[in-house]
Each structure stands twice: as C-alpha cells, then as structure tokens.
Amino acid sequence: MSRVRTKTVKKASRVLIEKYYTRMTNDFHNNKRVCDEVAIIGSKPLRNKIAGYITHLMRRIERGPVRGISIKLQEEERERRDNYMPEISTVDPSQLTSIKVDTDTSDMLKAAGFNLPNVTVEDQGKNKGK
C-alpha cells in the first residue's frame, strides 16, 4: 500500500525536474544520486521520497505533458503545434469544386441565409423509405 506524498516532496520534485531535467532518468538510484549532488536535503528518508517521486514523474513525462511542470522542450513542442499552418487550406474556396449535401441540409442553409455557390444537392437512397 502506498503513502500520500506531502506538498514538500511534490514541490521539491517539480523544482528539481524543471532545473535538472537533463540529468534525471527513470532510475531511482540515479535520481537519488543527482538529488544528493544538486540539492541540500535535510534527511535521508526525505531525499529518498523526493527521488522516488521524481522517478514517478519522469515516467509520466515520457507519456506526455505533466501538469505543473514546464520543461523547455515541452514548451517548444506546444508552440510548434499551436503555430502550425497547413500549406493548402481544406476550406479554401478556390480549391473546393463542390459541396455535396442532402435536401435537409440544403433547406437549413437557405433558411439561415447562406448563399453558397458550390452547393449541390444529392438525394440519399436510404432516406427515401421514410
């Protein structure tokens, strides 16, 4: 059965990961050694708890972004995704030849006041039996 981690352990782990991300791994013993080198931690059990939580967080970071931890690599990746612009727009009017809709959708477009030139009405074979 596991224990609840205190906010001291969580905060210290997050700070250490943000500052020394490149030195941390999924290995508890390596993280324990890095904690000894870079931080002044009051007791051995506290150091072990922090190193254990760092190991836990590093495994989570491998799977995806973790809330509360901002790593420069993740920030750059997020910026790249947010600023992505496709070369050819899928809704570019010059690229669209025609939009195929059924009669109900056509009626809704007319009722809403949309006057789209590329709309062609197609009858659906499966809706005729209603």
From Swiss-Prot:
Ranges of compositional bias, category Basic and acidic residues: 74-84
Gene Ontology biological process: translation
Region (Disordered): 74-97
Record-linked InterPro entries: Ribosomal_eS17, Ribosomal_eS17_CS, Ribosomal_eS17_sf
Gene Ontology molecular functions: structural constituent of ribosome
Disulfide bonding pattern of the chain: none
HAMAP family for this protein: Ribosomal_eS17
Protein name: Small ribosomal subunit protein eS17
Species annotation: Caenorhabditis elegans
